[in-house]
Swiss-Prot record:
One of its GO terms (molecular function) is homoserine O-acetyltransferase activity. One of its GO terms (biological process) is methionine biosynthetic process. Residues 50-360 form the AB hydrolase-1 domain. This is Homoserine O-acetyltransferase. The gene is metXA. It comes from Caulobacter vibrioides (strain NA1000 / CB15N). The keyword Amino-acid biosynthesis applies.
Amino acid sequence: MAALDPITPAGGGTWRFPANEPLRLDSGGVIEGLEIAYQTYGQLNADKSNAVLICHALTGDQHVASPHPTTGKPGWWQRLVGPGKPLDPARHFIICSNVIGGCMGSTGPASINPATGKTYGLSFPVITIADMVRAQAMLVSALGVETLFAVVGGSMGGMQVQQWAVDYPERMFSAVVLASASRHSAQNIAFHEVGRQAIMADPDWRGGAYAEHGVRPEKGLAVARMAAHITYLSEPALQRKFGRELQRDGLSWGFDADFQVESYLRHQGSSFVDRFDANSYLYITRAMDYFDIAASHGGVLAKAFTRARNVRFCVLSFSSDWLYPTAENRHLVRALTAAGARAAFAEIESDKGHDAFLLDEPVMDAALEGFLASAERDRGLV
């Protein structure tokens, strides 16, 4: 099988919360009739011990290993999910859901508010990473899984993994945190604010009610994506890929995209608006900004993981990731160790920046495969 051949999901669709089980949010709000869109790959074994939950990043979705229904592009982590890969449907029952607040089928600001018959827009309640995880836990239960073999995620997905370990440690055997942090830094909040302001400054945003006017703030969302995408890269990677190469034979002596890197960013922005909702971008980036695992534990990160001492952790960082640098990952590992948890850690040398966890990184693949193989032996799966 080719490295990026799609695999067929074993199941999936949309799960609707029972009418008597609304999702209660950290903000004090409630979402009635919440829907969660998800995909599964593989089969649950007889003792239901092989389930793996994959948590996606900011602009990801549930289509982790199958073609995206809008763009037709391969699943965002098809490199690692598939036959003979670290996460193998022949061995694992793999679950991936679109986070609440998202725009790929789970309830979010673009969904219809049953109370009004119109899209939620900004009437959608502000959500947190913990709210996302609470919804995932209910979905996992609905799928017949009590304890997950592993919870795996990178970037915002890694935040969800940590939240699982804090809130539901008894429901997970192992945890893999890639290119993440235990709280959002001031720099990261600042970049998110630039993106949000770009969206809200677009005249077509219409106070978040753009759907009612039949328009979309595409220009603002594209600029937000361009700014964010820079943080996912690294200077060495940009220099290697683009340098100061021109898009054409000579300078335009104007403000068109003279440089290849400019054209690349414009393409990233314009293609992003075809698959993502602007209000979802506001809500999910705000959830990331609010993320601070230690905040509700007296500011002491180790205390947050006290109940997770029986969970096996793997934490991987990348040397050129300046969005979630290695120092922040080491801080997490020290806290896990202080809490009495088993934590394996590695910094992977890479010049690809934050997005390295999504790209071809054989050392990461080997580390992940080795950790999961060890955990499978300890779990009695092999």
